[in-house]
């Protein structure tokens, strides 16, 4: 079945318009949502500020959206900061003293905060107090300021890099996992309605299968299919059009992109399937180690295409099969 697309005149608020505003609009992550809903409602019922929260997991899975939902749920403001920009106490003072009672203070990539800034957060999180230094030199003096009670929400793709003193100060910790294809179809169905795109379930499933279990990528692919159909298919969209649009992005039916294929090909064709170190792989494909570890490796492991060992990464038989290679070559069998 083919549908017409109603092209939006303005798409500048694309990401914000698709962001769920309450937990009932947040698809997937059932157990996490149940726990968070109970946690927030209990605090509201007691007329208290919710405890500090930490969300961790791969990028693009909704950690920032959960911070927005928390602010909407308790009816308070949201202040957003980025960990790499918070290196020293002076980077935090203005943000902390500007918070109103009950505000959500969201720090993305919290694991990348500077150590001095992190330690400055401890009394703010525990006692809602900070010390500031007035003047300098022999006449310098320290003054303790009271802060409005707030909820710190941290998001990280690398929970293991958080120090124990920081990690244990969070009252609520939740892992955000990759989404199922069914959950992504639900997300895409909602997004297509908001963007006035008519697409049937078959078409949305075609997009979901290639979205790597990630809502952010799924929504971006939906917009790309919409653009492709507008420019190449007379504003008509169906599963065949979606398949052609996604093939143009070099995304295969498993959701692997050009870098994924390069990684697997290097491991199989040049290192007999491994083990091979991540630094070697990074040089071979022209990416840095951190990008590969954060953006590519988790999905390859999830799909059973790569294994991590003490000696390095190893391509699995599924990887050989997906690339139409003979797994017997790995062991030099006849």
Swiss-Prot record:
This is Holliday junction branch migration complex subunit RuvB. It is found in: Cytoplasm. DNA binds at residues 308, 313. PANTHER family: HOLLIDAY JUNCTION BRANCH MIGRATION COMPLEX SUBUNIT RUVB, PTHR42848. Belongs to the RuvB family. Homohexamer. Forms an RuvA(8)-RuvB(12)-Holliday junction (HJ) complex. HJ DNA is sandwiched between 2 RuvA tetramers; dsDNA enters through RuvA and exits via RuvB. An RuvB hexamer assembles on each DNA strand where it exits the tetramer. Each RuvB hexamer is contacted by two RuvA subunits (via domain III) on 2 adjacent RuvB subunits; this complex drives branch migration. In the full resolvosome a probable DNA-RuvA(4)-RuvB(12)-RuvC(2) complex forms which resolves the HJ. GO terms for biological process: DNA recombination; DNA repair. One of its GO terms (molecular function) is ATP binding. Its EC number is 3.6.4.-. One of its GO terms (cellular component) is Holliday junction resolvase complex. Residues 180-250 are annotated as: Small ATPAse domain (RuvB-S). ATP binds at residues 18-19, 60, 63-65, 126-128, 169, 179, 216. SUPFAM superfamilies: P-loop containing nucleoside triphosphate hydrolases, Winged helix' DNA-binding domain. InterPro entries: AAA+_ATPase (IPR003593), AAA_lid_4 (IPR041445), DNA_helicase_Holl-junc_RuvB (IPR004605), P-loop_NTPase (IPR027417), RuvB-like_N (IPR008824), RuvB_C (IPR008823), WH-like_DNA-bd_sf (IPR036388), WH_DNA-bd_sf (IPR036390). Pfam families: AAA_lid_4, RuvB_C, RuvB_N. Its main location: cytoplasm.
């Amino acid at each position: 079945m083919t549908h017409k697309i109603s092209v939006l005149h303005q798409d500048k608020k694309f990401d914000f318009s698709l962001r769920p505003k309450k937990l009932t609009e947040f698809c997937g992550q059932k157990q996490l949502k149940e726990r968070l809903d109970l946690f927030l409602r209990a605090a509201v019922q007691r007329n208290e500020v919710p405890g500090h929260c930490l969300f961790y997991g791969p990028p693009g899975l909704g950690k920032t959206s959960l911070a927005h939902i928390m602010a909407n749920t308790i009816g308070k403001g949201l202040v957003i900061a980025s960990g790499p920009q918070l290196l020293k106490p002076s980077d935090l003072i203005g943000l902390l003293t500007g918070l109103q009672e009950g505000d959500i203070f969201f720090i993305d990539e919290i694991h990348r905060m500077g150590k001095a800034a992190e330690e400055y957060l401890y009394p703010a999180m525990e006692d809602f107090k900070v010390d500031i230094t007035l003047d300098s030199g022999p006449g310098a003096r320290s003054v303790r300021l009271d802060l409005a009670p707030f909820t710190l929400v941290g998001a990280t793709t690398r929970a293991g890099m958080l120090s124990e003193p920081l990690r244990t100060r969070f009252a609520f910790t939740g892992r955000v996992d990759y989404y199922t294809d069914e959950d992504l179809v639900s997300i895409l169905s909602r997004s297509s309605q908001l963007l006035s795109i008519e697409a049937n379930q078959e078409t949305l499933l075609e997009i979901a299968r290639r979205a790597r279990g990630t809502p952010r990528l799924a929504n971006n692919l939906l917009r790309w299919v919409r653009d492709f159909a507008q420019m190449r298919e007379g504003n008509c969209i169906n599963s065949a059009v979606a398949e052609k649009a996604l093939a143009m992005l070099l995304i295969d039916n498993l959701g692997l992109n050009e870098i994924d294929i390069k990684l697997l090909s290097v491991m199989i064709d040049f290192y007999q399937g491994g083990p091979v170190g991540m630094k070697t792989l990074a040089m071979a494909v022209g990416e840095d180690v951190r990008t590969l570890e954060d953006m590519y490796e988790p999905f390859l492991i999830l799909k059973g295409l790569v294994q991590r060992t003490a000696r390095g990464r190893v391509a699995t038989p599924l990887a050989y099969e997906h690339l139409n290679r003979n797994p017997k070559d790995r062991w030099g069998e006849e």
